[in-house]
């Protein structure tokens, strides 16, 4: 039975970048990795209502910089920057002897962001909204925002059924095997009275073509 590779992992180094931008030797690698995991989990849990799409972590000697991509930056920053200071102080307890810098980046089109779409569908399922309706509405909003294609999948005891199943809905094209295709992927879980329901979303935003070198400029430089 065919399984799908993670679209982001497949394209790292081709058209996608790492979410963790640091290097460590064997001695410190495991500690840094666990620290990253704790930071991501804490920020996600603490700022779930703000719609956190992804978190980039950059490390220097005694400094950690977090780039938090969110649909509602005001909710994280808070009044007069109080929210961001509170978050920094809480993170400082997780990360020992390191200075934390937090940079908030606004997600301009949350209706076209795969992670935020998945979380939105999951939230609707928890509010007992029909899964088909939640999926179709999200697809319509995404297509209106200008994406080339979108595919959604819900897995679990849908509508309280005795036997778990998976249902897919898609519109447009999703070229999963094309490496230059900019495909965004998101996953979320809905905690319902019947158990967990997994939500997966793939969004195709178009092709990323390599920058063409200007031959004339190159010739002038050599002359």
Swiss-Prot record:
GO molecular function term, any single one: mRNA binding
| UniProtKB keywords | Ribonucleoprotein, Ribosomal protein, RNA-binding, rRNA-binding
Superkingdom: Bacteria
The family database entries (InterPro entries) matched by this protein are listed as: KH_dom, KH_dom-like_a/b, KH_dom_type_2, KH_sf_prok-type, Ribosomal_S3_C_sf, Ribosomal_uS3_bac-typ, Ribosomal_uS3_C, Ribosomal_uS3_CS
Q: Which Pfam families match?
A: KH_2, Ribosomal_S3_C
Residues forming the KH type-2 domain are 39-108
Q: Which GO terms describe its cellular component?
A: cytosolic small ribosomal subunit
What is any one GO biological process for this UniProt entry?
translation
Looking up SUPFAM superfamilies in the UniProt record yields: Prokaryotic type KH domain (KH-domain type II), Ribosomal protein S3 C-terminal domain
Provide the function of this protein.
Answer: Binds the lower part of the 30S subunit head. Binds mRNA in the 70S ribosome, positioning it for translation.
Q: How does it assemble?
A: Part of the 30S ribosomal subunit. Forms a tight complex with proteins S10 and S14.
Q: Which family does it belong to?
A: Belongs to the universal ribosomal protein uS3 family.
- The protein in question is named Small ribosomal subunit protein uS3
This chain's source organism reads Clostridium botulinum (strain Hall / ATCC 3502 / NCTC 13319 / Type A)
- Gene expressing this chain: rpsC
